[in-house]
Amino acid sequence: MTFCYPCRAFALLTRGFTSFMSGWPRIYYKLLNLPLSILVKSKSIPADPAPELGLDTSRPIMYVLPYNSKADLLTLRAQCLAHDLPDPLEPLEIDGTLLPRYVFIHGGPRVFTYYTPKEESIKLFHDYLDLHRSNPNLDVQMVPVSVMFGRAPGREKGEVNPPLRMLNGVQKFFAVLWLGRDSFVRFSPSVSLRRMADEHGTDKTIAQKLARVARMHFARQRLAAVGPRLPARQDLFNKLLASRAIAKAVEDEARSKKISHEKAQQNAIVLMEEIAANFSYEMIRLTDRILGFTWNRLYQGINVHNAERVRQLAHDGHELVYVPCHRSHMDYLLLSYVLYHQGLVPPHIAAGINLNFWPAGPIFRRLGAFFIRRTFKGNKLYSTVFREYLGELFSRGYSVEYFVEGGRSRTGRLLDPKTGTLSMTIQAMLRGGTRPITLIPIYIGYEHVMEVGTYAKELRGATKEKESLPQMLRGLSKLRNLGQGYVNFGEPMPLMTYLNQHVPDWRESIDPIEAVRPAWLTPTVNNIAADLMVRINNAGAANAMNLCCTALLASRQRSLTREQLTEQLNCYLDLMRNVPYSTDSTVPSASASELIDHALQMNKFEVEKDTIGDIIILPREQAVLMTYYRNNIAHMLVLPSLMAAIVTQHRHISRDVLMEHVNVLYPMLKAELFLRWDRDELPDVIDALANEMQRQGLITLQDDELHINPAHSRTLQLLAAGARETLQRYAITFWLLSANPSINRGTLEKESRTVAQRLSVLHGINAPEFFDKAVFSSLVLTLRDEGYISDSGDAEPAETMKVYQLLAELITSDVRLTIESATQGEG
């Protein structure tokens, strides 16, 4: 056999060249990865993709990216390796076939536009689907991934495209150079190719459809991340001035004040300048850097729950309205920071006009704040301009945030909602907008609120200090260890769905020009507001501080041994874990001992050591302040506390009688604390709590009766103390009603507060909300709604006395005597 040496040499050369070429991409990626590792610091969304998205790493995973970018691919690779996900550069071997683990949907633009490589995504999709046809056990998880460098939405005039368009190589280089530290990798829920193959087949048309759906997915995801383009401020004002509603309000202003039309129009422009935000992406980026640095030093962690449901709504095109509870001025910054890091657009925020002082006002305005006055009364032009501005935000697709409580809670409990802005939100729907508006209730919790000392002073009568630069600097100078922060997203409320269910003919009120107030608007808004408050509380977060404060404040001397405190925290934790307040509420996974150690680091408690062990003390000067944190989770424990109080008082009681007692008091508790259960749900909840209390050994169940267990009576008494002050307040009001059935509501509220203040002094009650005007006002309204007070103002003596007698059994005899003697003394 003859051998051709030139042929052999050619074969060796070809093999070497092929080997070199096959290794070249690896060398190329290594070289490219060197500058990227320095320039790019990306963030994964969600923070831990595999468990949060339910990815099964034991099954094949492939990644789908929107367009061909090696920088994006290597950024994705870094995040995959950091989270123990398969390396996208490693091919996927299936039944002896090697396939790339990543797919680019679009080839992407090039510097030289005439050169466009052949798009291979459809072929790859078809190859993957075809493997599923031949292998019935195969199930590849297709994970869409977006890699974004920067998130500036751009302006309506100026830039032709926002910076997140598909970039060619040169553009991508500068994007990485300038925005590498402001990048994120967004993992989406996986799509099962097995399900696709089984339900839709495996031919090429399905592959084409899959690629088309993926393109739509990425387009929506980009819009959810960057938001719509921003208008030039003057163009926005011109559009508002041209609206019929503002034009009419300007005419009315000129006529009523006897000024020229130009002067009235100038007044409207001044109001727009006062109200409107001046959103700046560069300010968002700068503030994000500052806050990231600050949070890492002040907070030990920011815990975010249920953000995926919000990302999905944004992806589906919903107009998002964030409705958080209001604990602190920190809420504005914290929520925007969290949303930004969840891959969502920071919202336009309705901020109180009191924050519009230099330099905070201009900064907040560039971060998306628009300012709202405390009242609209007597200024029709202002109310019209504000309503039209809010409607314009909705029509343009911007997310919005406002605090439905109207102001910061001074007690740690939710305030009764203020419905003005919510009403305007529904009026915006009645203008005939096409995008669905969805309200997102949000629970914000802290282990330290910097204003809590000021709140206590204000509740005791001090004048509220006006916000200013010196006050802000004093507050910032006091910031130390703030512990943990909590942002829990509650159950969304799609307004269209709500109106369809409760006001079926609401579309008949749509008017694209004029703001309308149909007869159903006010009661519907009130119901929505109340529902929102319930949903906010449903997303409550228990933490080390509020649990320890609850236990120590339940003790008469505000002190417990470490063993007693541990036992009490275990009681709370087991109740919350085994009978959850709601599916949206969160409970620490740490042990009671670990929570105590963490709380002690906050320097709110004192520890006395002796030969027996540690005694943990809540100092008297701190007790008033710590009620704030206890009140954050009062709603989560009030029902088991009430049950414990009833069982403790009676020593043994049948389930039916217990249910009767709870049923009498529950409407007041529900209204005050925005509890989630309806009356018909109570029997099941009480049964579940009773079974859990039996499991803990707090009570025994004998012949359908609940008996106190003497061995754990202290734990049961401390649990019961959580309802103690609430029951005392109810006793005050019901005694006053019984003693004077014809008392008017205003006098009833005033006298209730007077007796409560007296009780607070004589019996050392440290809770400022004990005699809070708003609490008694809400209670009296509930009594009217429940029929204890008639429309004419008179009470029903027999019913009120019956309830008072029930309450009198649940409070101590000395407190009862103080209540009764106080009213007798006044008489």
Swiss-Prot record:
Molecular function terms, GO-annotated: glycerol-3-phosphate O-acyltransferase activity
EC code: 2.3.1.15
Cellular localisation: Cell inner membrane
CDD domains with a match to the protein in the record: LPLAT_DHAPAT-like
One cellular-component annotation, GO: plasma membrane
Topological type in the membrane: Peripheral membrane protein
Record's keyword annotation contains Mitochondrion: no
Motif HXXXXD motif per record, residues: 325-330
Pfam families recorded: Acyltransferase, GPAT_C
Pathway in which the depicted protein is active: Phospholipid metabolism; CDP-diacylglycerol biosynthesis; CDP-diacylglycerol from sn-glycerol 3-phosphate: step 1/3
Keyword Transport belongs to the record: no
Reactions that this protein is recorded to catalyse: sn-glycerol 3-phosphate + an acyl-CoA = a 1-acyl-sn-glycero-3-phosphate + CoA
Highest taxon in the source lineage: Bacteria
UniProt keywords, alphabetically: Acyltransferase, Cell inner membrane, Cell membrane, Lipid biosynthesis, Lipid metabolism, Membrane, Phospholipid biosynthesis, Phospholipid metabolism, Transferase
GO biological process: CDP-diacylglycerol biosynthetic process; fatty acid metabolic process
First-tier enzyme category under EC: transferase
Similarity field: Belongs to the GPAT/DAPAT family.
Listed PANTHER family: DIHYDROXYACETONE PHOSPHATE ACYLTRANSFERASE, GLYCEROL-3-PHOSPHATE ACYLTRANSFERASE
HAMAP family recorded: Glyc3P_acyltrans
Domain-level remarks: The HXXXXD motif is essential for acyltransferase activity and may constitute the binding site for the phosphate moiety of the glycerol-3-phosphate.
Protein name: Glycerol-3-phosphate acyltransferase
Gene from which the chain derives: plsB
